[in-house]
From Swiss-Prot:
<dbReference type="GO" id="GO:0005829">
    <property type="term" value="C:cytosol"/>
</dbReference>
<keyword id="KW-0547">Nucleotide-binding</keyword>
<dbReference type="InterPro" id="IPR014729">
    <property type="entry name" value="Rossmann-like_a/b/a_fold"/>
</dbReference>
<dbReference type="Pfam" id="PF09190">
    <property type="entry name" value="DALR_2"/>
</dbReference>
<dbReference type="InterPro" id="IPR015273">
    <property type="entry name" value="Cys-tRNA-synt_Ia_DALR"/>
</dbReference>
<feature type="binding site">
    <location>
        <position position="234"/>
    </location>
    <ligand>
        <name>Zn(2+)</name>
    </ligand>
</feature>
<dbReference type="InterPro" id="IPR056411">
    <property type="entry name" value="CysS_C"/>
</dbReference>
<keyword id="KW-0862">Zinc</keyword>
<keyword id="KW-0436">Ligase</keyword>
<comment type="subunit">
    <text>Monomer.</text>
</comment>
<dbReference type="InterPro" id="IPR009080">
    <property type="entry name" value="tRNAsynth_Ia_anticodon-bd"/>
</dbReference>
<feature type="binding site">
    <location>
        <position position="29"/>
    </location>
    <ligand>
        <name>Zn(2+)</name>
    </ligand>
</feature>
<feature type="binding site">
    <location>
        <position position="209"/>
    </location>
    <ligand>
        <name>Zn(2+)</name>
    </ligand>
</feature>
<dbReference type="Pfam" id="PF23493">
    <property type="entry name" value="CysS_C"/>
</dbReference>
<dbReference type="InterPro" id="IPR032678">
    <property type="entry name" value="tRNA-synt_1_cat_dom"/>
</dbReference>
<feature type="short sequence motif" description="'HIGH' region">
    <location>
        <begin position="31"/>
        <end position="41"/>
    </location>
</feature>
<feature type="binding site">
    <location>
        <position position="269"/>
    </location>
    <ligand>
        <name>ATP</name>
    </ligand>
</feature>
Length: 481
């Protein structure tokens, strides 16, 4: 099966065939750096990180460009409120964004351009549009004329007449048509500005991405991504600007990730259900958040809640428990001359899932099946003496680490990760690690004295707090849930 992707432009899955064999150019709209990133930003960036990783995994040479929007109305407003420059504010939140993405385990894009470093490219692109007669200057502002681009709204499939009837011209704007949008904004007091043929000013939001994407990927490239909220107006306007200037198809495949709801409601500051990545990572491990995002198909809406994150933590713990158990057993089983195709089989079904429009939910399901097989085999009587089964577990273990790496998962030492999770969960019970060890000693003493009622009482008391005691040949261990 070859890779198929869902193209927003056509509304269907298509076989992925890049413009240049073996090479992929991918542009993803980055954040506007005026505040800390929220869970919606986490989803978009994790999704396209996985797409980037998987394309590389299957052999493509990928140039991945993800920008910073570092000049914008929101940045200017926030900077003025704080009494600092836009540059200072943008720099602060670029650093914060990078820290958040590093914690989430994102691979670094090939290029991370800033809009303010591409003013010359933006000005040149605006001039090309004026020269082609589809943009016009008005009192220092420059607008794109949507009526002169007949295929406008082809991405969002909106109706021009309906859009026009609902559009309004903001006081001070000198548009010919309410639907026209700004390419260049004349300078205003208290705003950053750059020189241009139309006087000092700054770029509009949409033109920034057109200029940066074409600068690094060419006038036509393979993949443009972002959240569904960017389809209109941002991506629609990018198409109009770019194709209006070049006369060429701008992007071959448009990919958009779904929304994040919070407790089945739209995330909104006004509803009080707005969570930054930093808020979430105070309670949950970054890999848990990443795992949660990947358990849904990227185009589907995803519901963020404490319960769903707890479920994700439990699911990821099961992977690490299986990997930890397998590593301990395999360490006592020297490699033999028997091989197994189990790893290759797992990779095949994993790739089938990912080739179906990057279906991470199905891919993770196949990895879960592998962990269940490992857990079953290593607990079978006589396992260590069965060379075929040892080889099967070794092959599955190696494949899990390899394929998990494609998803940015299972990157920690299993024993260390499980201990960290145990201690984090224990902290919510009011007990300390030494408290649990003391309970275990008391229980051992009770059992030694045949006071089984007291031993059961201790076990049940801990279980009520979400702490499970695990009796084994090496003694009693504990696990917090």
């Amino acid at each position: 099966m070859s890779l198929r992707v869902y193209n927003t432009m056509t509304g269907r899955k298509e076989e992925f065939e890049p413009l240049q064999p073996g090479k992929v150019g991918m542009y993803v709209c980055g954040v506007t750096v005026y505040d800390y990133c929220h869970i919606g930003h986490a989803r978009a960036n994790v999704v396209f990180d996985i797409i980037y990783r998987y394309l590389q995994f299957i052999g493509f040479d990928v140039t991945y460009v993800r920008n910073y929007t570092d000049v914008d109305d929101k940045i200017i407003k926030r900077a003025n409120e704080r009494g600092i420059s836009s540059d200072t504010l943008a720099g602060e939140f670029i650093q914060a964004f990078d820290e958040d993405m590093n914690r989430l385990g994102l691979a670094e894009p090939t290029i991370q351009p800033k809009a303010t470093c591409h003013i010359d490219h933006i000005v040149n692109l605006v001039q090309r549009l004026i020269d082609r007669g589809i943009a016009y200057e008005s009192q220092g502002d420059v607008y794109f004329s949507v009526e002169d681009f007949p295929s406008y709204l082809k991405l969002s499939k909106r109706n021009m007449d309906e859009m026009r009837s609902g559009a309004r011209i903001t006081p001070g704007e000198q548009k010919r048509n309410p639907m026209d949008f700004a390419l260049w904004k004349a300078a205003k007091p208290g705003e950053p500005s750059w020189e241009s043929p139309w006087g000092p000013g700054r770029p509009g939001w949409h033109i920034e991405c057109s200029a940066m994407s074409m600068e690094y990927l060419g006038e036509s490239f393979d993949i443009h991504g972002g959240g569904k909220d960017l389809v209109f107006p941002h991506h629609e306007n990018e198409i109009a600007q770019s194709e209006g200037a070049t006369g060429k198809p701008f992007v071959k495949y448009w990919l958009h990730n779904g929304f994040v709801n919070v407790n089945q409601e739209k995330m909104s500051k006004s509803l009080g259900n707005f969570f930054t990545i930093r808020d979430i990572l105070q309670t949950y491990d970054p890999e848990v958040l990443r795992f949660f995002i990947l358990t849904a198909h990227y185009r589907s809406p995803i519901d963020f809640s404490d319960q769903n994150l707890q479920d994700a933590r439990l699911g990821l713990s099961r992977f690490y428990e299986g990997l930890h158990a397998a590593s301990e057993v395999l360490a006592a089983c020297p490699p033999g001359d028997v091989t197994s195709e189990a790893g290759a089989t797992l990779e095949n079904v994993f790739r089938e899932a990912m080739d179906d429009d990057f279906n991470t939910a199905a891919a993770i399901g196949h990895l879960f099946d592998a962990v269940r097989t490992i857990n079953r085999l290593i607990t079978e009587k006589g396992f260590r003496k069965n060379r075929e089964k040892v080889a099967q577990v070794r092959a599955l273990y190696d494949a899990l680490l390899k394929l998990g790496g494609v998803l940015g998962l299972f990157v920690s030492d299993p024993a260390a990760w499980l201990k960290q999770m145990n201690l984090a969960m224990l902290a919510t019970t009011g007990y300390t690690e030494s408290d649990i060890e003391d309970f275990i000693r008391q229980r051992q003493e009770a059992r030694k004295n045949k006071d089984f009622a007291r031993a059961d009482e201790i076990r049940d008391e801990l279980a009520a707090k979400g702490i499970q005691l695990l009796d084994g040949p090496q003694g009693t261990a504990w696990k917090a849930r």
